[in-house]
């Protein structure tokens, strides 16, 4: 099971992903594809955050991408970045809706 937590607090954002879909059923091509989709979404968010930092619009708190874990946290007032990340995060929601045995999402806002 892969768990995704998406937090929003003021100008701060955090996306925390833990787990592996493929480990649930190591022989499942479906689990492998879902895990690959999760990885692609996380890497896309990270790249958008890095691009926004390069323009001076975002302060990165942490970007860690490794097997079974992703942490992406940042502070920004860049509406374009926030819109892009919100759109990408809809991909996590869609994966949870279609593959609840592999993905669990939680959203927190303060």
Locate each region found by the language model.
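N-terminal intrinsically disordered, cationic/polar leader segments
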Residues: 1-33, 43, 47-110
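A short mixed-secondary-structure module that forms the rim of ligand-binding clefts
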Residues: 35-38
